[in-house]
């Protein structure tokens, strides 16, 4: 019997340790966030999402053949006040376009400072970046880990750049992804694209060929516009309730 129970017991112990580390990361993040909020920092969530070409065109690629199609990466930010008054960016992501923009984050920080004053800029940590942390940093107590750079697919986010504009950059650990209202906004944007792409499509037939032109920029702009300030208040209020629950249960 011990021979059979031992693997199960080891799994329970490892899982318990892993859950404890995740809980500690979330608590450290939330306590750091609340401290900054009490000091007068407004919360802004900064991030990106990928829009595959097939999502825009409606093309069915589930026939078993893998076809590499272009993907657009949309970068934007928002908070309880709605979308930040900053022109969002759209980058084409394919094997020929993998450059990260270095100056864009500085421009963003400057715009946010003029619009809101000092802010805590929350950026969702990419899973592979979290796994590259030193183990002692992931398990450290009493202090929140802030990487020297948070790398998104298209932008490098540097804490020193944020500080130069009076902001603080905060990395949202992957176990706390549900505390990021941007994910819900990106989901709403993608559903808008699916449900309304035909309205932004122009078709023509010439010499037996059919052509389709999609007003991509208009489609994205309208989808972002539909997620108005009222919806953002709802999204951030939901996140706030989760934060309160987590702090009350595990602090």
Curated annotation (Swiss-Prot):
Matching InterPro entries: C21orf140-like (IPR037728)
Entry's family note: Belongs to the FAM243 family.
Protein name: Uncharacterized protein C21orf140
Encoding gene (name): C21orf140
């Amino acid at each position: 019997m011990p021979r059979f129970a031992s693997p199960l017991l080891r799994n329970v112990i490892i899982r318990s340790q892993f859950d404890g580390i995740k809980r500690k990361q979330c608590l450290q993040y939330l306590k750091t966030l609340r401290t900054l909020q009490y000091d007068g920092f407004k919360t802004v969530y900064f991030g990106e999402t990928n829009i595959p070409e097939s999502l825009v065109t409606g093309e069915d690629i589930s026939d078993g053949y893998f076809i590499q199609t272009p993907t657009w990466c949309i970068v934007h930010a928002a908070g309880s006040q709605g979308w930040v008054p900053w022109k969002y960016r759209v980058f084409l992501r394919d094997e020929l376009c993998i450059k990260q923009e270095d100056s864009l984050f500085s421009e963003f920080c400057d715009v946010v400072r003029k619009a809101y004053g000092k802010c805590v800029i929350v950026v969702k940590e990419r899973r592979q970046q979290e796994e590259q942390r030193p183990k002692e940093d992931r398990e450290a107590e009493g202090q929140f880990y802030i990487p020297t750079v948070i790398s998104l697919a298209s932008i490098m986010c540097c804490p020193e750049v944020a500080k130069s504009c009076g902001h603080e950059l905060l990395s949202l650990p992957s176990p706390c992804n549900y505390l990021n209202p941007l994910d819900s906004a990106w989901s709403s944007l993608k559903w808008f694209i699916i449900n309304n792409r035909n309205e932004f499509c122009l078709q023509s037939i010439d010499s037996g060929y059919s052509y389709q032109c999609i007003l991509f920029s208009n489609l994205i702009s309208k989808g972002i516009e539909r997620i108005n300030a009222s919806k953002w208040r709802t999204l951030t209020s939901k996140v706030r309730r989760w934060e309160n629950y987590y702090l009350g249960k595990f602090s």
